[in-house]
């Protein structure tokens, strides 16, 4: 017989989910397992590349609902196949299912963050704006993964991406 995960048990399961890289569980928003490189693989990759060049093995992303954080490192090679796979690492329904375990009657903070090529972009809002946050996270992830290193530098110094100002006004 299946047992519903609630309260402290849900947080405990979410914390273990963050570290063991499991996927497809009852509460994780991610569909793919964590693919963090081993220390040996990381060193090998960076010793072959020039010090001033940025050729990441992948990217980090996270979803958080209140104090519960789900993190993943995913491999990304910059190809169309790799992009399609990376964009499918989570879907609207998996995020909604995970969030529903932590959302109660009160408003809590929800955040999506992606780190790629040394730049981190985070979008957040209250639980009442979760659907809009998911839409923005989809667009943000697609845009960030398709940028060249020089475009990333330009966007970092240019401020927030298009649409953030409107979202901040809506969520107030």
Curated annotation (Swiss-Prot):
It comes from the Viruses. This is RNA silencing suppressor p19. Residues 153-172 are annotated as: Disordered. The keyword RNA-binding applies. Belongs to the tombusvirus protein p19 family. Keywords: Host-virus interaction, Inhibition of host innate immune response by virus, RNA-binding, Suppressor of RNA silencing, Viral immunoevasion. The keyword Transmembrane does not apply. Viral suppressor of RNA silencing which binds specifically to silencing RNAs (siRNAs). Acts as a molecular caliper to specifically select siRNAs based on the length of the duplex region of the RNA. InterPro entries: Tombusvirus_p19, VP19_sf. GO terms for cellular component: virion component. Gene3D superfamilies: RNA silencing suppressor P19. GO terms for biological process: symbiont-mediated suppression of host innate immune response. Homodimer. SUPFAM superfamilies: Tombusvirus P19 core protein, VP19 (SSF103145). One of its GO terms (molecular function) is RNA binding.
């Amino acid at each position: 017989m299946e047992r519903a995960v609630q309260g402290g048990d849900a947080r405990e399961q979410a914390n273990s989910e963050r570290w063991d890289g499991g996927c497809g569980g009852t509460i994780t928003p991610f569909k793919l397992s964590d693919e963090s490189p081993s220390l040996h693989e990381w060193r090998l990759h960076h010793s072959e590349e020039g010090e001033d060049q940025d050729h990441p093995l992948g990217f980090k992303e996270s979803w958080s609902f209140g104090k519960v954080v789900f993190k993943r490192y995913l491999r990304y090679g910059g190809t169309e196949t790799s992009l399609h796979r990376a964009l499918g690492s989570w879907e609207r329904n998996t995020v909604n299912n995970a969030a529903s375990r932590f959302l109660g009657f009160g408003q809590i903070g929800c955040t999506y963050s992606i780190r790629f090529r040394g730049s981190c972009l985070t979008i957040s809002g209250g639980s009442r704006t979760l659907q809009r946050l998911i839409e923005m996270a989809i667009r943000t992830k697609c845009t960030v993964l398709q940028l060249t290193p020089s475009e990333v530098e330009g966007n970092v110094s240019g401020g927030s991406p298009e649409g953030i100002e409107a979202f901040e006004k809506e969520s107030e």
